[in-house]
Amino acid sequence: EQRPLCNECFICDRSGDPRCLCEDHVPQCHEGCHQCEKVDTRSGTTMYQCRSFEYYDCAN
């Protein structure tokens, strides 16, 4: 199973499977996201952010 990659992890738990609260703004939340929120950006482009504690691969 390939997990989404998070570039800006807000909180990361690396014990066992890495899990994090991801701060990335994306065009569409991944299908496993349980709490997807719309984010208004400075450019006016509508983006989304997954606000649930998910199994991400932490890039940082």
UniProtKB/Swiss-Prot annotation:
Belongs to the Bowman-Birk serine protease inhibitor family. Serine protease inhibitor. One of its GO terms (molecular function) is serine-type endopeptidase inhibitor activity. The record marks 14-15 as: Reactive bond for trypsin. It comes from Hyacinthus orientalis (Common hyacinth). This is Bowman-Birk type proteinase inhibitor B2. It comes from the Eukaryota. The keyword Disulfide bond applies.
